[in-house]
């Protein structure tokens, strides 16, 4: 979309309304108003998501690629990490598998749902789309390494029984995750920034339009954080209602984590979808794969610190079914994104894997 020199009123008001709804809920308005207040919370949630996407576009257009996509990925992940850590500290040892479930859901949603939808949307509108193969290959290699080391390898170590690392192993893997993600960010933003830039031939008014003023970009950055914070907290507040609905429908509780992860990732997902529709697939893939890398590369070290500080055993290893789906997703992503050209075929394959993931979660 074209970035204006001033912000529309709805993008400024939406996060304020979201935080007012949160304050009202804390003061007991939900008990007074009843079910209607839940509908207001849902409306506030989606308004916050749309506002976050808009402000992210403003910031991204100001700082340019690939910094703009990195801003949104790190901002969402930082708030996601804070939410997971706070839930772990509040829930105690019973929540030691929360980080694993959240990270795995995020990786599967991004690698199959988000990427698949972007490839399908872009391919259906523009036919064949192209992107920089070197940047995407670097993203996939880093993601595969971190995902296998953190979610699969714990099942096969022998120092500690169960799907967990020992204290020394956990500390080592946390450092390894930070090294891999830090190196990726260095390559993306400094050493080989050109690998992640959109093709110069792309003709889009948003790419060539003048960037917004610095003051407007700083305001949007602050409002972006406010939007993301409101989205995460509203999702957390709606979780009990959502869980009751899922249980009432006879579905497994694991579906709740998938739905919450989807809501938290909506700002990045919508931004990536819009970029793919505008024939900027490089930007779309930067958003999607960068989000997955930030999610797993920053969350695991953070929860490892909590685990080491509290003495809780952190469950990281996923089960056999999840391992098969994760490996399938990585292999398919490597093949479908390995040529630098995509069509609706690749998008359909990713979405089918995502559908299988959802179905086997509901019907294990």
Placement of each model-derived feature along the sequence:
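Hydrophobic alpha-helical segments, chiefly the membrane-spanning helices
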Residues: 1-364
């Amino acid at each position: 979309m074209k970035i204006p020199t001033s912000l529309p009123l709805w993008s400024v008001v939406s996060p304020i309304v979201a935080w007012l709804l949160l304050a009202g809920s804390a003061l007991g308005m939900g008990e007074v108003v009843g079910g209607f207040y839940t509908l207001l919370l849902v409306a506030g949630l989606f308004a916050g998501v749309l506002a976050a996407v808009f402000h992210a576009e403003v910031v991204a257009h100001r700082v340019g690629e690939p910094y703009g996509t990195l801003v949104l990925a790190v901002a969402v992940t930082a708030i996601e990490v804070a939410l997971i850590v706070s839930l772990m500290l509040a829930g105690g040892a019973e929540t030691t598998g929360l980080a694993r479930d959240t990270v795995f859901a995020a990786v599967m949603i991004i690698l199959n749902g988000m990427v698949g939808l972007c490839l399908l949307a872009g391919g259906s509108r523009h036919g064949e789309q192209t992107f920089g193969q070197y940047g995407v290959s670097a993203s996939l290699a880093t993601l595969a390494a971190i995902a296998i080391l953190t979610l699969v390898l714990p099942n096969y170590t022998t120092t500690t029984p169960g799907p967990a690392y020992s204290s020394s192993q956990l500390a080592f893997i946390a450092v390894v995750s930070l090294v891999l993600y830090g190196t990726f960010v260095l390559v993306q933003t400094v050493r080989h920034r050109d690998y992640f830039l959109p093709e110069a031939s792309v003709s889009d008014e948003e790419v060539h339009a003048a960037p917004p003023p610095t003051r407007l970009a700083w305001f949007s950055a602050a409002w972006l954080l406010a939007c993301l914070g409101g989205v995460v907290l509203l999702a957390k507040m709606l979780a009990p209602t959502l869980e009751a609905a899922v249980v009432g429908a006879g579905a497994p509780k694991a579906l709740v984590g998938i739905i919450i992860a989807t809501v938290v990732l909506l700002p990045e997902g919508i931004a990536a979808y819009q970029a793919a529709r505008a024939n900027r697939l490089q930007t779309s893939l930067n958003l999607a794969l960068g989000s997955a890398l930030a999610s797993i590369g920053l969350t695991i070290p953070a929860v490892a610190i909590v685990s080491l500080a509290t003495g809780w055993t952190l469950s990281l290893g996923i089960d056999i079914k999840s391992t098969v789906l994760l490996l399938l997703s990585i292999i398919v992503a490597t093949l479908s994104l390995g040529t630098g050209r995509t069509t609706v075929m690749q998008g359909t394959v990713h979405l089918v894997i995502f559908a299988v993931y959802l179905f086997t979660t509901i019907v294990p």
